[in-house]
């Protein structure tokens, strides 16, 4: 089929033979996209020529990454779509075949404006198909909280239809802001895909949703589940039911019942009257555990060799290696699983790095809270943030709370197992912007083990309060709560999706959002 002039990235190329383009696999893919367009039009997802669909040609003889791409055009009535309307592209997005122009009143053929966004899903996630829907529920769900950067839901049966999720899991869909032109969304969608490795969809506020899957069946199934869940969210909102918690109780019920809340502070977020300082844990308190385990830890693990190799002779890395050697020698004496000897420097750079990588990978796998590991991770993450390969994630109630505490004159500090540098990087590069202006200081394991009472005494001495009771500590870890309480801190335990269960009769006040404080 000859090209009739297309506005996509590249002109028609000759990288695939005419015979293959006219062959059975490509023909079936064209017909499939046309059929899906008609089906989704009936669903209300692609009305008014909006929305688009693309699939990879199903040819088992060709690796998925190299398969041709079939993509629906722009400006064509989806309910009247036929196979001949489709564009066929190479795996890199180069157009190989374009539709023939039709007589007036049909518009000249034009490749979908979604093409660069579709290519991001193909290249970054190895997708087999991508669906862009303008379904009403995908727009309204993003309007319920105009400031939210994520959509969250848990304990709904249809969550099981989303890849990698179960009934009890928390579904998280990143939300990016709309732009006047579709192609202008490319960078923000790319950043969201990178920041949320478990996600198979991105919502565009007041616009729609992009959904991808390993195959057209998987993408279609997930798209149907997403639309169901977003529609359920809207209906639950109308009923005053909270879709973000396992109990699905009344929205803000806890907030309404607590007399501690102040009408002067929007959304609560006011510390107890006696508190002069708030000390926050990160993982499971300000930030989802999944972000740390699924993004931060894997990034450090996957980049430790490159980091050590490229910075081996720097003073900073020499110090990191010195601390690791001391820790590993101690681990070997104590029979710690996964510890392997580190050869002397005379053995050569490569041998030293190989042994260090093996030890670090073992430490990360065991989630050890030790200073040498945390310091090295912080230096690796710094590079990730500088390269924009990492972006900090916090729960949506956190920025509001930090701002309100700051406005009320309450000083806020962080106490985390991660290094102080890593803490600053995370809060300085969040999806909500730089939050460090609301923080007064940072504590890490150099202050002491977070499960030991002595550590909280050291924190209280550093903060200069008259009494430890003037410090409110919020954490998700029971043992940390006990240690802080034994020092005299006021303590609240954070209940977030994915956090470890608490023992029965633990005796601590719990919250699911900072808005309850």
Swiss-Prot record:
GO cellular component: cytoplasm
Superkingdom of origin organism: Eukaryota
GO biological process: L-methionine salvage from methylthioadenosine
Keyword annotations of the record: Amino-acid biosynthesis, Hydrolase, Lyase, Magnesium, Metal-binding, Methionine biosynthesis, Multifunctional enzyme, Zinc
Region: Methylthioribulose-1-phosphate dehydratase, residue numbers: 1-242
Cofactor: binding details: Binds 1 zinc ion per subunit.
Region ranges (Enolase-phosphatase E1): 278-517
Cofactor: Zn(2+); Mg(2+)
Keyword Magnesium: yes
Name of this protein: Probable bifunctional methylthioribulose-1-phosphate dehydratase/enolase-phosphatase E1
Active-site residues (renumbered): 157
Binding-site list for Mg(2+): 281, 283, 476
InterPro entries linked to this entry: Aldolase_II/adducin_N, Aldolase_II/adducin_N_sf, Enolase-ppase_E1, HAD-like_sf, HAD_sf, MethylthioRu-1-P_deHdtase_MtnB, MtnB_viridiplantae, Salvage_MtnB_euk
The EC number(s) this enzyme carries: 4.2.1.109, 3.1.3.77
Disulphide connectivity of cysteines: none
Origin species: Sorghum bicolor
């Amino acid at each position: 089929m000859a090209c009739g002039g297309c506005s996509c990235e590249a002109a028609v190329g000759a990288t695939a033979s005419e015979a293959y383009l006219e062959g059975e696999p490509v023909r079936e893919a064209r017909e499939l996209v046309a059929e899906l367009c008609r089906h989704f039009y009936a669903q209300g997802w692609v009305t008014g020529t909006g929305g688009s669909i693309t699939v990879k040609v199903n040819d088992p003889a060709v690796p998925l990454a190299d398969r041709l791409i079939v993509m629906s055009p722009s400006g064509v009535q989806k309910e009247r779509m036929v196979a001949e309307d489709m564009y066929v592209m190479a795996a890199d997005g180069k157009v190989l075949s374009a539709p023939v122009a039709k007589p007036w009143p049909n518009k000249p053929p034009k490749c979908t404006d979604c093409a660069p966004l579709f290519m991001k899903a193909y290249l970054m996630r190895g997708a087999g198909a991508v669906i862009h829907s303008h379904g009403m529920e995908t727009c309204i769900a993003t309007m319920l909280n105009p400031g939210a950067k994520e959509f969250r839901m848990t304990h709904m049966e249809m969550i099981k239809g989303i890849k990698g999720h179960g009934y009890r899991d928390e579904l998280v869909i990143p939300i990016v802001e709309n732009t006047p032109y579709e192609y202008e969304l490319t960078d923000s969608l790319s950043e969201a895909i990178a920041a949320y490795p478990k996600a198979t969809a991105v919502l565009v506020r007041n616009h729609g949703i992009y959904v991808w899957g390993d195959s057209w069946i998987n993408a279609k199934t997930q798209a149907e589940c997403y639309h169901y869940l977003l529609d359920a969210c809207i209906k639950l909102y109308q009923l005053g039911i909270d879709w973000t918690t396992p109990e699905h109780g009344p929205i803000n019920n806890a907030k309404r019942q607590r007399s501690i809340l102040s009408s002067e502070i929007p959304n609560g977020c006011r510390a107890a009257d006696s508190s002069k300082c708030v000390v926050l844990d990160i993982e499971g308190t300000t930030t989802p555990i999944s972000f740390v385990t699924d993004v931060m830890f894997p990034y450090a693990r996957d980049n430790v060799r490159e980091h050590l190799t490229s910075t081996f002779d720097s003073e900073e890395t020499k110090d990191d290696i010195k601390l690791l050697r001391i820790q590993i020698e101690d681990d070997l004496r104590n029979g710690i699983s996964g510890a392997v000897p580190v050869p002397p420097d005379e053995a050569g750079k490569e041998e030293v790095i190989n042994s260090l990588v093996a030890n670090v990978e073992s430490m990360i796998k065991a989630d050890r809270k030790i200073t040498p590991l945390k310091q090295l991770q912080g230096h690796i993450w710094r590079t990730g943030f500088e390269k924009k390969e990492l972006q900090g994630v916090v729960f949506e109630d956190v920025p509001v709370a930090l701002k309100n505490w700051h406005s009320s004159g309450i000083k806020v500090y962080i106490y985390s197992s991660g290094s102080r540098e890593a803490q600053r990087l995370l809060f300085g590069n969040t999806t909500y912007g730089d939050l460090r202006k609301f923080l007064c200081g940072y504590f890490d394991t150099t202050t002491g083990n977070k499960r030991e009472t002595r550590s909280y005494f050291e924190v209280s001495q550093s903060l200069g309060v008259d009494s430890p009771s003037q410090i409110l500590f919020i954490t998700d870890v029971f043992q940390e709560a006990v240690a802080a309480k034994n020092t005299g801190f006021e303590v609240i335990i954070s209940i977030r999706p994915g956090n470890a269960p608490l023992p029965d009769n633990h005796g601590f006040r719990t919250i699911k959002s900072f808005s309850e404080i």
